[in-house]
Regions:
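Extracytoplasmic ligand-binding site segments that recognize negatively charged/polar headgroups
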Residues: 86-89, 132-142, 156-173, 209-235, ...
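Proline-aspartate-enriched helix->loop->beta-strand connector
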Residues: 115, 122-128, 265, 269-273
Length: 338
């Protein structure tokens, strides 16, 4: 996932008030078992960092996306940081099905991490994803040293790896933290993910001419997703979806995207455009004011659908995403681009 515009959008998100409703659904898996009688707990994270504790961590603090993934696997963090509460008090989609009434908050927007409150929670472990190697997402650079002195951290690499491998990695960490990988909700979610993947593969095979593009935007630029850098989009391409994407990303912007000015927003065209649905992203209604964008075939045809760019890496999370995607693509025309 991108650092730019992800980082840019994170900053913009301070003022965002509109969000995508969080989904309800499957009963949650049982909480991870306590560590009574356990010996030394060890874990090697995706930085190659070896963590060794006297017993299994009980008090886990996690970035919202990591918390959401762990929650689906049965781990109950004591606190979260990163987007989790909307301005109206509702749950931000980025935190998945985490019960935000039952967890502490140590930061809700980019750059916000209350180190003093974090320390007061007596954490055993901090968990966060990493889009850039060795950089924990939403842990401010200026706070890293202080955070590291309070408790060890475990990073999960979210770029440069296949979608399923990232999901499995969160599952492995959850199991190490005491969650039951064979709990009925976890097994049901895996089956649902497999079924959604198969259904999307069938749709792709039946509609090879349906062209799909994925974008995000800021007031200054349109960002067209570069397929190889996004685990979810790459997975859909492997299932057979006809993804329109740049030949290479804009390297000066950190990869992940080709950055296109709004005047050149018609450089790539597709029958369907999936638009970043994060609360901090530029909204479709706002993008409508950009003349070149408004003339795109998919825009004129009304074939704009959400892309859940910050979906949690769990079977349940991506099962829901692919079910929604299949429903949207089924109703889309494949002759919009001539």
């Amino acid at each position: 996932m991108p650092t730019v515009p992800r980082r840019t959008l994170a900053a913009v998100g301070v003022a965002a008030a509109i969000g995508v409703s969080a989904c309800g659904g499957t009963a949650p898996p049982p909480a991870a078992a306590p560590a009574s009688g356990q010996g030394t707990w060890t874990w090697t994270d995706d930085r190659g960092k070896n963590i060794s504790l006297p017993s299994r961590p009980q008090r886990v603090v996690a970035q919202s996306g990591a918390a959401a993934a762990l929650w689906d696997f049965g781990v109950r963090p004591v606190a979260v940081f990163g987007p989790h509460r909307l301005k109206d008090g509702g749950r931000d989609p980025e935190v998945g099905e985490v019960d935000i009434a039952k967890v502490e908050s140590i930061g809700n927007v980019w750059g916000e991490f209350n180190v003093e409150k974090y320390a007061s929670l007596r954490p055993d472990l901090l968990v966060a994803g990493m889009y850039q190697k060795n950089t924990l997402w939403y842990v401010p650079e200026e706070s890293v040293q202080a955070v590291d002195q309070i408790a060890p951290s475990a990073g999960v690499q979210l770029s440069g790896k296949p979608l399923v491998e990232i999901i499995e990695r969160y599952g492995q960490l959850a199991a190490a933290l005491g969650a039951d990988p064979k709990a009925a909700p976890v097994v049901e979610a895996k089956n649902r993910f497999d079924a959604a993947s198969a259904a999307l593969r069938t749709l792709a095979a039946a509609r090879p001419d349906l062209k799909v593009m994925v974008v995000t935007a800021t007031p200054d630029n349109l960002y067209v997703a570069y397929l190889p850098d996004h685990p979810d989009i790459k997975y859909w391409g492997e299932l057979g979806l006809n993804i329109v994407h740049p030949a290479r990303p804009t390297e000066s912007e950190g990869g992940f995207w080709e950055v296109v000015s709004w005047e050149n927003a018609d450089k790539y065209q597709a029958d369907v455009i999936l638009v970043d649905a994060r609360t901090q992203s530029m909204k479709i209604e706002e993008m409508a004011g950009k003349p070149t964008w408004a003339k795109l075939p998919a825009v004129r045809a009304g074939q704009l659908y959400p892309w859940h760019a910050a979906e949690r890496y769990s079977y349940l999370g991506y099962a829901k995403v692919m079910e929604e995607l299949k429903t949207n693509l089924e109703q889309a025309r494949d002759d919009v681009v001539k």
